[in-house]
């Protein structure tokens, strides 16, 4: 997805972010359901991506089709997409799929640690998705069964759940979507895409810290506390030592490089680390 479609998807993801702390699997299932309706009707896809129709007109069409049949949030998200600009009829479906998967991923992220080892819901989701793909890749028979056009979606979902019986509910939703509605892809390729979305969200909360020399335990603790305060949650720190680094320290959280102004907001972090 590129150009105007990419811009529309980015805007939709930004708008979705406000709903994610309270996201539910039901919302994701509703969005996947809307996607199924859109994918099943070439006429509807054309209507929703027709550049000659106004955004308000296309949004109203979605509200007319789905109002009262899905939650207010689902209808709002779908109508927002319809009111945006798309380069191709396929792109709006791809965007719906991405938003629905993002909701599932957020539900997993919102879970607290789920095991004695401290693994998070997001990590568990990624592990389950990888386990499913490994199970499929290890069996030609399973691959044939999942690609059999005569097999029902329900049968494929049942087979998938047998492959990863202990998977989280979030993983089951994404895997079920991939095997029942792969949208022209191999199911494992779509699951891999979902895993990449989860990994990207996980990366947002990893601080990669490059320093010219190893930090002491005390310095690392102050750095951790400062970053946690800045981002409003506990970050995982990956420490790299680079003697050639200019400036003594470089911090990157997800796609964001923590610049001098942010370091100042951390309470003169550089001076603290030097102490």
Curated annotation (Swiss-Prot):
Topology versus the membrane, per the UniProt entry? Answer: Peripheral membrane protein
Q: What's this protein's family per the entry?
A: Belongs to the ATPase delta chain family.
Keywords from the named record: ATP synthesis, Cell membrane, CF(1), Hydrogen ion transport, Ion transport, Membrane, Transport
Function recorded in the entry: F(1)F(0) ATP synthase produces ATP from ADP in the presence of a proton or sodium gradient. F-type ATPases consist of two structural domains, F(1) containing the extramembraneous catalytic core and F(0) containing the membrane proton channel, linked together by a central stalk and a peripheral stalk. During catalysis, ATP synthesis in the catalytic domain of F(1) is coupled via a rotary mechanism of the central stalk subunits to proton translocation. This protein is part of the stalk that links CF(0) to CF(1). It either transmits conformational changes from CF(0) to CF(1) or is implicated in proton conduction.
How it assembles, according to the record, is: F-type ATPases have 2 components, F(1) - the catalytic core - and F(0) - the membrane proton channel. F(1) has five subunits: alpha(3), beta(3), gamma(1), delta(1), epsilon(1). F(0) has three main subunits: a(1), b(2) and c(10-14). The alpha and beta chains form an alternating ring which encloses part of the gamma chain. F(1) is attached to F(0) by a central stalk formed by the gamma and epsilon chains, while a peripheral stalk is formed by the delta and b chains.
- Taxonomic classification, please? Bacteria, Bacillati, Actinomycetota, Actinomycetes, Micrococcales
Q: What InterPro entries does the database record attribute to this sequence? A: ATPase_OSCP/d_CS (IPR020781), ATPase_OSCP/dsu (IPR000711)
This one is known as ATP synthase subunit delta
User: Sorted alphabetically, which PANTHER family does this protein's record hold?
Assistant: ATP SYNTHASE DELTA CHAIN
Species whose genome carries this gene: Arthrobacter sp. (strain FB24)
Q: Does the keyword DNA-binding apply?
A: no
């Amino acid at each position: 997805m590129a150009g105007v479609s990419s811009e529309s998807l980015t805007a939709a993801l930004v708008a979705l972010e406000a709903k994610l702390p309270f996201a539910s699997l039901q919302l994701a299932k509703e969005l996947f359901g809307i996607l199924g309706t859109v994918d099943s009707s070439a006429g509807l896809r054309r209507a929703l991506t027709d550049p000659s129709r106004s955004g308000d007109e296309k949004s109203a069409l979605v509200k007319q089709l789905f109002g009262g049949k899905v939650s207010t949030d689902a209808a709002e998200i779908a109508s927002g997409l319809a009111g945006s600009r798309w380069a191709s009829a396929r792109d709006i479906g791809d965007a719906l799929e991405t938003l629905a998967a993002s909701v599932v991923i957020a539900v997993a992220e919102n879970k607290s640690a789920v095991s004695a080892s401290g693994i998070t819901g997001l990590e568990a989701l990624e592990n389950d998705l990888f386990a499913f793909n490994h199970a499929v890749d290890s069996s030609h028979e399973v691959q044939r069964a999942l690609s059999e056009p005569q097999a029902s979606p329900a049968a494929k979902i049942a087979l998938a759940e047998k492959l990863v019986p202990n998977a989280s509910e979030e993983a089951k939703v994404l895997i079920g979507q991939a095997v029942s509605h792969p949208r022209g892809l191999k199911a494992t390729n779509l699951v891999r895409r979902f895993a990449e979305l989860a990994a990207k969200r996980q990366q947002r909360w990893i601080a990669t810290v490059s320093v010219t020399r190893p930090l002491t335990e005390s310095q690392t603790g102050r750095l951790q506390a400062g970053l946690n305060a800045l981002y409003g949650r506990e970050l995982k720190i990956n420490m790299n030592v680079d003697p050639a680094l200019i400036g003594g320290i470089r911090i990157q959280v997800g796609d964001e490089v923590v610049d001098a102004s942010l370091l100042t907001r951390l309470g003169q972090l550089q001076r603290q680390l030097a102490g």
